[in-house]
Swiss-Prot record:
GO CC, alphabetical: cytosol
Assigned protein family: Belongs to the DNA mismatch repair MutS family.
Binding residues annotated for ATP, in chain numbering: 609-616
Gene (UniProt): mutS
Keyword Nucleotide-binding: yes
Protein name according to UniProt: DNA mismatch repair protein MutS
Region (Disordered): 801-825
CDD domains: ABC_MutS1
Length: 876
């Protein structure tokens, strides 16, 4: 059997480094390429569509390999990281010319999904958050950081659901955990397709001390330690741009879980998963990348503190009413680059000359921005922002004096530093540019000094520069200055101290100039690094101004109005409100506004009307108006008086939960239960067609029970749309419920949607008319109409509005009889002939007959219906 080929020293070095990074692709620098070997090469060639070749092809065991050019490596790294992989970048860390034996190589950075900072990897207005989780004393410490900007937030979370909602909201791609986090939590995180990286060891460092100095809770300090330790291990450099950790409480903001944010399409379009057609798309007239990122954060976390909301409103109103100042501000903001990420590049040492010119350009526009805000700040509205508008003139002046206006991308190829900044560098540059002139001047000078007219200065690769004198003139040379260098047949070649100095200067000028320029550049970079906190503070102020001017611009263009918000009562009064995204897509002339009025004596609007008439749009319209108001923007209405809401819960649309494998109905019940268990009087509930995922009467019973529970126990403002017209009679027993419907009329057999909300219940659903609009065959529609008439004549089920939780004990027997009759009616409706039931079905039927639906809580009903469905679906 042939023996395996002995590894070369280079491959031994590769294997030693690879052992340290078993879970990452190792990009091993070899000349002008990054090479991958063995399994990395096989897998990498497939993912990156590279040619798989072999090293030592003639050996018994050739090594699979593939590679990418070093100058194009970032694109390939981005692809791997975007697919959830890690990439270890291994560089030559010594000059091959000076290496004794094998060139030393080290991993200089581990790029992961949560730490990628290259701009090409994502949009400028997107954050890339790395999160961390640590469990201690029955609490979860949770932290997240954007490595490109230095933003660092920390909190204490008490439930797994809250953790999952935060992870989804942050769109995190990677989370750092330690052994304190149990498998149940890890499995639920894995279901979100998030890369889990384990970091058990921690270290105290200057970065940890700085980041946690305002943090008091020990579990928060500990999670910061794990997070920063992981960053230092992966990035292998100082993290001087990390900001002080800011503690936040999810309860400080309007709470919306993942389902609510998804259903309301705040940041992502449900259909396309893109920005277009979302609230973010509507409100984004920001001019800077950092403003765009901050806008997303504000939309994701609306305020609940009235004073904070009013402070934003005042600034928006000020900007809105001063058009010329706002226009001037926008013109300045357009010229401000991404200060946050420029600061990050400075800290990482990846900043180049062009980045510094962007920084200088940005800083040069701050004085005018400051002047505009000062003009608007007579009443002190902008005091907090104004104080942070620091032009950082010392840094702007430094860059202006030192860096060329159009520098190259590379920081090692020269042409970075302006003439006059460094005398030594100027001499090198002069030597490069004027070497021939110097030599000509020296030649003339030596001829004059020696009286030798045919004396000449020459150059060859072996001896360098020399002075050549014919043998007949040797006696004219001074003895002390000329040193013999080479003897020819008819001449001698010499060098003088001055020529030797010029030779050294000329020959080394280019390389020395590049070295000196890089040294000067790194010195400038280090000076700027000392001012990173000032740059970050300025960036925050500019970003806030950008979002506020965006609100003012959108409010002006959309004719939005300043809402009156209060914590004194629970009344809601919106006149001629509209869904701003739909209106922008359709055009103002095509969209019909609607009022929403719910005073302290009205908690539930029961909405009926045809499909496609606008019930869901009306509900989303209210929720979006609340979000827009509580981020400090004006709202789409003619007038609006609103309370401050603490939470928004939605149950809109039908979608199976593919991650957990649960049905539409089960998802519906779970989402509904989250609302029922967590809502307060100050919450907003939006329920669309609750109960449609199960049998008709089961659904109707659930819907009625949920409405009554909300009305009698929670007292939250609730919009509940339904096709169960039988429920409209509930307004007789529930004094804080009102029926409304979306108007529609039949004309010449056609259905016309009025899209106007009207008082009272709808007379019917017009389902067959909607099917006609969808283009279903006439024959099918006629058959459906015939069946509908038959069903309506045979069934006369109505809700007994006198039944309520307060009277349940007196009507248990009646409920049992009605439940039995309803079940029999359902069986006769869909199975007119006798049906033979197995023992399991008979058992369930008996349970259904005996179930006291009106004596159960909504959650009890959900659980028992789910149990029945599960048992009936079992294959016997």
């Amino acid at each position: 059997m042939p023996q395996k080929t002995k590894q070369t020293p280079m491959m031994e070095q590769y294997m030693q480094i690879k052992k340290q990074y078993p879970d990452a692709f190792l990009f091993y620098r070899l000349g002008d390429f990054y090479e991958m070997f063995y399994d990395d090469a096989i897998k990498g060639s497939q993912i990156l569509e590279l040619t798989l070749t072999q090293r030592n092809k003639k050996a018994v065991d050739p090594i699979p390999m593939c590679g990418v050019p070093h100058h194009a490596a970032q694109n390939y790294i981005d692809i791997l990281v975007d697919k959830g992989y890690k990439v270890a970048i291994c560089e030559q860390v010594e000059d091959p010319k000076q290496a004794k034996g094998m060139v030393k190589r080290e991993v200089i950075q581990l790029v992961t999904p949560g730490t990628i900072i290259d701009e090409s990897a994502g949009e400028a207005k997107e954050n890339n958050y790395l999160t961390a989780l640590h469990f201690e004393n029955d609490q979860y410490g949770f932290a997240y950081v954007d490595l490109s900007t230095g933003e660092l937030k920390v909190s204490v979370l008490n439930t797994i659901d809250t953790i999952l909602n935060e992870l989804i909201s942050l769109r995190t791609k990677e989370i750092v955990v330690d052994s304190s986090v149990n498998d149940d939590v890890l499995n639920q995180i894995k279901n979100l397709k998030i890369l889990i990286s384990e970091q058990n060891d921690t270290e105290d460092s200057s970065e940890v001390s700085f980041a946690s100095q305002d943090v008091e809770n020990s579990v928060e300090v500990e999670v910061i330690k794990h997070l920063i330790t992981y960053l230092k291990i992966t990035q292998k450099r100082a993290l001087s741009h990390l900001q002080r950790a800011v503690h936040y409480e999810p309860s400080q903001y309007l709470k919306m879980d993942y389902h609510a944010k998804r259903n309301l399409e705040l940041l992502r379009n449900l259909r396309t998963q893109k920005k277009s057609g979302t609230l973010l798309w509507l409100l984004d007239s920001t001019k800077t990348a950092m403003g765009g990122r901050l806008l997303k954060q504000w939309i994701d976390r609306p305020l609940i503190n009235l004073k904070e909301i009013e402070a934003r409103q005042s600034m928006v109103e000020n900007l809105l009413t001063h058009y010329f100042e706002r226009s001037g501000l926008q013109e300045e903001l357009v010229n401000v680059y991404d200060l946050e990420r420029l600061a990050g590049k400075v800290a990482f040492g990846s900043v180049n000359g062009r980045d510094l010119i962007q920084l200088r350009t940005s800083l040069e526009h701050i004085p005018q921005i400051r002047y505009i805000i000062q003009e608007l700040n007579d009443d002190g509205t902008f005091d907090e922002i104004f104080d942070k508008l620091d032009p950082i003139e010392d840094i702007a002046d430094l860059i202006e004096q030192a860096i060329e206006d159009e520098p190259p991308i590379s920081v090692t190829d020269g042409n970075l530093i302006k003439p006059g900044y460094s005398q030594e560098l100027d001499e090198y540059v002069d030597a490069m540019k004027n070497g021939k002139a110097w030599l000509a001047e020296l030649e003339a000078k030596e001829r004059q000094a020696t009286g030798i007219n045919n004396l000449k200065i020459g150059f060859n690769r072996v001896f360098g520069y020399y002075i050549e004198v014919s043998k007949g003139n040797l006696s004219k040379l001074p003895e002390d200055r000329y040193q013999r260098k080479q003897t020819l047949t008819n001449a001698e070649r010499f060098i003088t101290p001055e020529l030797k100095e010029k030779e050294s200067l000329i020959l080394g000028a280019e390389s020395k100039a590049k070295e000196l320029e890089y040294k000067i550049f790194t010195g400038i970079r280090d000076q700027i690094k000392d001012e990173i906190q000032r740059i970050q503070e300025l960036a925050g102020a500019v970003a806030a101004l950008d979002v506020l001017q965006s609100f003012a611009t959108v409010s002006e263009q959309g004719h939005f109005v300043k809402p009156e918000l209060t914590t004194d009562n629970h009344s809601l009064d919106i006149k001629d409100g509209w869904h701003p995204v739909v209106e922008k897509v359709m055009g103002k002339q095509s969209y019909i506004p609607n009022d929403i009025k719910m005073d302290d004596d009205l908690d539930v609007l029961l909405i009926t009307g045809p499909n496609m008439s606008g019930k869901s749009t009306y509900m989303r319209q209210l929720a979006l108006t609340v979000v827009i108001a509580q981020i400090g923007c004006f709202v789409p209405a003619k007038s609006a008086k609103m309370p401050i809401f603490d939470q928004i819960f939605t149950r809109i649309g039908a979608a199976d939960d593919l991650i957990s494998g649960e049905s539409t109905f089960m998802v519906e019940m779970k989402e509904t239960n989250v609302a029922l268990m967590n809502a307060t009087r100050n919450s907003l509930l939006l329920f669309d067609e609750i109960g449609r995922g199960t049998a008709t009467y089961d659904g109707m019973a659930l819907a009625q029970a949920i409405i009554e529970y909300v009305h009698n126990n929670i007292h939250a403002k609730t919009l509940f749309s339904t096709h169960y017209h039988e429920l409209t009679i509930l307004d007789e027993s529930l004094d804080k419920l009102q029926n409304v419907h979306v108007g529609a009329i039949e004309k010449n057999g056609e259905l016309i949607f009025l899209h106007k909300m009207q008082e009272g219940p709808a007379d019917k659903s017009y389902g067959i008319h909607v099917a006609k609009l969808a283009g279903m065959p006439d024959k099918l529609l006629k058959r459906a109409d015939s069946i509908l008439n038959k069903l309506e004549s045979e069934n006369d089920f109505t809700v007994d509005s006198t039944e309520s939780y307060a009277e349940e004990k007196h009507i248990e027997e009646k409920n049992e009889n009605e439940t039995s009759e309803i079940q029999e009616e359902q069986l006769s409706l869909f199975q007119p002939e006798a049906v033979s039931l197995d023992s399991n079905q008979s058992k369930i039927l008996k349970e259904i007959k005996n179930a006291n639906l009106m004596g159960m809580t909504p959650m009890d009903v959900m659980n028992i219906v789910f149990k029945w469905q599960k048992e009936l679906n079992k294959k016997g």
